[in-house]
Amino acid sequence: TMKLVYKASLQGNELELTRKIAAPNKESNVISFGGQVFQQQVFDGKKGYAVQQGRKTELIGKDLETAKKKMLPFEDMAYITGKLDRIESLDGKNTYVIIMEDTEIFYDLASGLKVKSVRKANGPKGEIKIPTNYSDYKEVNGILIPHKLDQGMGRFNLNFVLQEVKINEEVEDKDFK
């Protein structure tokens, strides 16, 4: 199991992302804004739901299938079924680009670490691309974990900084209900 707590600032308010994950594919993501739960997505390994601004919807179709395919807590392991698309220069470094369903994942050739992902999603005006940059990797219990996530969210760029990481503690089955 793994629990990660990231914090970012948006328009002067604190945004907190709490991820709880358990093998083989249980996941809970809660985004709080100004102390209130803004968005939540939970998957118990078979079924799940999302809550956004108070509206709860069950995960169905493609969203449900994607959740079932994740191999947590190390979802990069699922990318072995992806396709090596190309080698691309990113910030002056060569990266492998893997295509996995609707996401491009960039791995630094020298370090092997994931440095970026770009997920395609449907927005109100058609397809949008959501980039996430991963950096400041530090070892925690023998596992390299990115301590900075920079995510593009429309007009805003959120700079998440890891505040807390717990491995094999503080995650229970009730977290996925």
Which residue ranges define each predicted feature?
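Residue-level signal for well-ordered, solvent-exposed loop/turn and beta-edge residues enriched
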Residues: 36, 47-49, 55, 93, ...
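Hydrophobic, aromatic-enriched alpha-helical segments typical of multi-pass transmembrane helices
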Residues: 40, 50, 59, 84-89, ...
